[in-house]
């Protein structure tokens, strides 16, 4: 997989290309990265890529020509078709399912905005999709781009040491993850649940499912509304709800 970022701050991406599981996978050649700086495609010797907005208003707007040239250059670096994504608070929310879809693609170009925004004509002519990481605003698209990259790359075979890690993450199964424990057996008076030390894999699996359902019901009940429950999940969920009703009564 080739991922390119159109950005005026290429160095910011060192954190994902050099460190952690994504950095290791990059060194192993499982995925490749290139930062494309639109300043190199500016039509002025100072490298300006922004200007005042027509109609007035605060801030500066990134100009279409250098961004378009940067995107077109990025496309030439691979024989595979590229999907161009603009990280924007106006885009569709990034979800696990979207990350799964993007992980299947061979070439992603991530457009990282700065200043007050990007000329709308560039978005209409060169961007395939706008994606948001949440209902809030940050100073630029680099951090959102890296969050998207991390979410996507951990789903690419070989990036994680054990693909089961990705499969058991929150949202992979449509519900939140269960609690996890490691040594010591007791910490500040809190002990590791006995079932996890029992060695009974069937009981452990059921406990983890029950805990995932309980956590989802308490923290993200909207996820359960979208989920088609299997009989075991329905049974466990009804038991949890009955416990909650007894506590409230």
Swiss-Prot record:
GO terms for cellular component: cytosol. S-adenosyl-L-methionine binds at residues 113, 133-138. It is found in: Cytoplasm. Keywords: Cytoplasm, Methyltransferase, S-adenosyl-L-methionine, Transferase, tRNA processing. It is an enzyme of class 2 (transferase). It catalyses: guanosine(37) in tRNA + S-adenosyl-L-methionine = N(1)-methylguanosine(37) in tRNA + S-adenosyl-L-homocysteine + H(+). Its EC number is 2.1.1.228. GO terms for molecular function: tRNA (guanine(37)-N1)-methyltransferase activity. Homodimer. Specifically methylates guanosine-37 in various tRNAs. This is tRNA (guanine-N(1)-)-methyltransferase. It comes from Neisseria meningitidis serogroup B (strain ATCC BAA-335 / MC58).
């Amino acid at each position: 997989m080739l991922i390119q970022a159109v950005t005026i701050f290429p160095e910011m991406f060192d954190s994902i290309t050099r460190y952690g599981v994504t950095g290791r996978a990059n060194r192993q050649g499982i995925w490749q990265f290139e930062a494309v700086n639109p300043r190199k495609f500016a039509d002025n010797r100072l490298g300006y890529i922004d200007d005042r907005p027509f109609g007035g208003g605060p801030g500066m707007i990134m100009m279409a020509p250098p961004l378009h040239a940067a995107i077109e250059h990025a496309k030439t670096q691979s024989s595979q078709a590229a999907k161009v994504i603009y990280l924007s608070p106006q885009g569709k929310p990034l979800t696990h399912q979207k990350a799964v879809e993007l992980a299947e693609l061979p070439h992603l170009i991530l457009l990282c905005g700065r200043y007050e925004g990007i000329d709308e004509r560039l978005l209409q002519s060169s961007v395939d999709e706008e994606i948001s990481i949440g209902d809030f605003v940050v100073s630029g698209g680099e951090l959102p781009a890296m969050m998207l990259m991390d979410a996507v790359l951990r789903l690419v075979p070989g990036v994680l040491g054990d693909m089961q890690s990705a499969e058991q993450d929150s949202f992979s199964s449509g519900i939140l993850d269960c609690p996890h424990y490691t040594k010591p057996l007791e910490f500040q008076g809190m002990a590791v649940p006995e079932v996890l030390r029992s060695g009974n894999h069937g009981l452990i699996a059921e406990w983890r499912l029950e805990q995932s359902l309980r956590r989802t019901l308490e923290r993200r009940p909207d996820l359960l509304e979208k989920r088609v429950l299997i009989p075991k999940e329905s049974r466990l969920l009804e038991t949890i709800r009955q416990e909650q009703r007894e506590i409230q009564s």
